[in-house]
A protein has these predicted regions:
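Functionally constrained cores in energy, signaling, and assembly domains
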Residues: 10, 128, 165, 298, ...
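Hydrophobic membrane-insertion alpha-helices, especially the h-region
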Residues: 12-26
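Membrane-interface motif at the C-terminal end of an N-terminal transmembrane signal
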Residues: 22-36
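Intrinsically disordered, low-complexity N-terminal regions enriched in serine/proline/glycine
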Residues: 12, 87, 97-99, 375, ...
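N-terminal Sec-pathway targeting helices
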Residues: 2-16
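Short glycine/threonine-rich beta-strand-turn micro-motifs
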Residues: 33-272, 277
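Generic N-terminal leader/processing signal
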Residues: 4, 8, 104-107, 145, ...
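Well-ordered beta-sheet/strand-loop patches within structured domains
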Residues: 2-3, 141, 149, 157-158, ...
Length: 401
């Protein structure tokens, strides 16, 4: 009996809350008036006691969908709001405000109204959206108008020996990530205004000052060959592919990388080569004479030799221990520019000879002498090649193996 009385009391209590809710909170009057409940704000703008139409008008006056400009100096580009589908979704947020005290259960609606009556306001944020793909298309137009690649300075030696230089130029590039970030921040703040175009300066990899520093021949070496043979043809091809190369400070030269595979596709013919201590025919015969010539020029120029291999048989075109055999994919000739200035490799091929010259800054020029020490055993000769650095009185100040 007591349990039934408790249930009845709870029912009466709930019923009283509902009745009080209907009367004291004025549910029916708000519903009939079709207005947003008081103390509801959108983006901290009071829309309470307004119809949806009135609220939309008020918010659109505060947050119009305006076009904006991206400016750079005297240049400017218009970005239309409609072209990027810019939208604050005001109508959706107004509907949310209108339904705040209507779209949940009766008790929850009463609870929300109670808080609003107690001056506890409810704020709804506007969410700005735009089409990123469409914006990117607009920004590409700006980038095409602004972006200019930096131009490297160049250094070239004609066959006549005449030196030609061109100057470097700085480039410019739109900082696209920063520009997009600025637009994103502006739109999210819903404060449409013009944006300054962020432009970065791009610098050339090779400057005018660097090529100006090339004013001297650091070292050179020549070898002879029969110009009228397939081997001679291969020397021409390899000599051209490894010539006119600007090697920046710290940069490494790779013979195999410059020539590529020595096959008929790259212009090489079959000619005598040394394989396993024997002379036979193979594609690219003669390329080792080019690598040997360049190697000796690099030795005399003080460049750092990273990789070099000798033939299994002595070469006719170079002293013992100063040849450089190469085999694509296996053995290579590599050296690095150790100086703070660039060096330039120039090969001159013709009239039965190939000459490799390495140009650089006269401040880097060393007095270098090459010395070979031969060691004879029963079956072979071993040659050790030393690079000697000399002072003005020809005293050895440093030597390298």
């Amino acid at each position: 009996m007591r349990g039934q009385i408790k249930i009845l009391n709870k029912f009466i209590y709930v019923a009283m809350i509902v009745v009080v809710g209907f009367t004291s909170l004025g549910l029916t009057s708000n519903e009939n008036e079709k207005k947003i409940h008081s103390n509801i704000t959108i983006e901290n703008i009071d829309v309470g006691k307004l119809t949806k139409k009135q609220a939309i008008k008020k918010l659109e006056a505060k947050y119009p969908l305006k076009d904006f400009y991206i400016t750079w100096g005297n240049e400017k580009w218009a970005i239309e709001a409609k072209s990027i589908d810019l939208d604050y979704h005001i109508e959706e947020r107004v509907n949310e405000a209108f339904n705040y005290t209507r779209d949940t259960s009766m008790l929850e609606n009463i609870k929300r109204k109670g808080k609003l009556k107690l001056k506890k306001s409810h704020n709804i944020r506007l969410k700005a959206t735009y089409d990123e793909i469409k914006l990117s298309k607009e920004l590409k137009v700006i980038c095409r108008a602004i972006n200019v690649d930096a131009v490297d300075a160049s250094f070239h030696v004609e066959l006549s020996g005449e030196i030609k230089r061109t100057k470097s130029k700085e480039g410019k590039k739109v900082d696209l990530s920063r520009l997009k970030e600025n637009i994103y921040d502006m739109i999210n703040k819903k404060k449409i205004e013009n944006i300054n175009l962020p432009v970065l300066t791009s610098y050339p990899k090779v400057s005018t000052e660097q090529v100006k520093s090339i004013n001297s021949i650091l070292g050179q070496f020549s070898t002879s060959f029969n110009d009228s043979t397939s081997r001679g043809s291969n020397i021409h091809v390899a000599g051209e592919s490894t010539s006119d190369i600007l090697l920046m400070p710290g940069e490494t030269f790779s013979y195999n990388k410059r020539t590529g595979a020595r096959n008929w596709v790259n212009g090489y013919k079959s000619a005598p080569i040394i394989v396993g201590g024997k002379v036979t025919n193979g594609e690219g015969g003669g390329v080792c004479q080019v690598s040997t010539t360049i190697y000796n020029a690099a030795l005399l120029s003080g460049l750092t030799i990273d990789e070099v291999h000798n033939h299994s048989l002595p070469s006719k075109y170079a002293p013992k221990g100063r040849d450089a055999t190469v085999s694509y994919g296996y053995t290579d000739l590599k050296f690095t520019n150790p100086y703070t200035h660039p060096v330039y490799i120039k090969n001159i091929v013709g009239n039965g000879a190939i000459t490799s010259k390495i140009y650089g800054c006269n401040l880097d020029r060393e007095r270098i002498s090459i010395r070979m020490i031969e060691e004879y055993t029963k079956n072979k000769i071993t040659v050790q090649t030393y690079r000697l650095y000399l002072d003005e009185e020809n005293n050895i100040v440093r030597k390298e193996l």
